[in-house]
Amino acid sequence: MRLVFAGTPEFARVALDALLAAGHDIPLVLTQPDRPAGRGLKLTPSPVKQAALAAGIEVAQPRSLRLDGRYPDDAAQAQAQLRQAAPEVMVVAAYGLILPAWTLALPPRGCLNIHASLLPRWRGAAPIQRAIEAGDTQTGVTIMQMDEGLDTGDMLLEHRVPIGAADTAAQLHDALAAAGGQAIVQALAALQAGNLPARPQPADGVTYAAKLDKAQAALDCAQPAALLARRVRAFNPVPGATLRLPGLDEPVKVWRAQALDASAAQAPGSVLRAGPEGIDIATGSGVLRLLELQKAGGKRQPVDVFVRGWQPPAHPLKSE
């Protein structure tokens, strides 16, 4: 099929590669403008832009698609490029810009979105992280016919993906990205064959995956250990769970932790023990064992290495 692709990060790049491998005609790709990245804050193209240029595809990078918005010239130019591309359908994956009504109406077969959850659960910006944080054991990707709502369009196809007990957001991201690429190729094949029925999203079971906030990554030891361990996994690698350890001026990042089936009489935040097997912290319910940490400005270290250079004073931990 002749299509336009809109996406920005690695999740979307995987889908673009799958569409190209399936032989779809993609004359135009939309992606976010280049952003500063790295230590030197050098302007860096998105993964999708890099893949598109490598494939010889024209790239558009409007700052907005709203003709009546802050960047009307950008939107008008993108509109002209889309009309010139004349796609049958538009595929959207983690693009990062709101698609106004004119965009949704332009392709004859509309706009299909690859969403990283089993809708209507986890509509919104951070479905991967919120699924882990909530303790879900299963998630997936939904191919959705886009409308003007927030992930409210009709569902066309689902691929289910299990969430392992130790999966981090990075690991689940990669699994869902691969599933998304497979799902959109399957959906377009069904669409071409006239066999892609749409189902309205049910009214029950709607949840929203709020955007990640760096402040939420600070672990509060008054909360249950099981929740804290899930948050460590959910916020790995971004924004990274943090905790203030006594004796250190800056909070440390916690890359791995586990909830122990144990109780503690000490106040939440108390260091119960520290050794090569882990740093055990009293919480509001249960014990959290820290397994991999990183000091500010340092490297990630397994706990047996970390504890050699840190001795816990006898007072509770504090959240960031």
Curated annotation (Swiss-Prot):
It holds the Pfam family Formyl_trans_N. Its EC number is 2.1.2.9. GO terms for cellular component: cytosol. One of its GO terms (molecular function) is methionyl-tRNA formyltransferase activity. It catalyses: L-methionyl-tRNA(fMet) + (6R)-10-formyltetrahydrofolate = N-formyl-L-methionyl-tRNA(fMet) + (6S)-5,6,7,8-tetrahydrofolate + H(+). Keywords: Protein biosynthesis, Transferase. InterPro entries: Fmt, Formyl_trans_C, Formyl_trans_C_sf, Formyl_transf_N, Formyl_transf_N_sf, Formyl_transferase-like_C_sf, GART_AS, Met-tRNA-FMT_C. (6S)-5,6,7,8-tetrahydrofolate binds at S117, L118, L119, P120. Attaches a formyl group to the free amino group of methionyl-tRNA(fMet). The formyl group appears to play a dual role in the initiator identity of N-formylmethionyl-tRNA by promoting its recognition by IF2 and preventing the misappropriation of this tRNA by the elongation apparatus. Belongs to the Fmt family. This is Methionyl-tRNA formyltransferase.
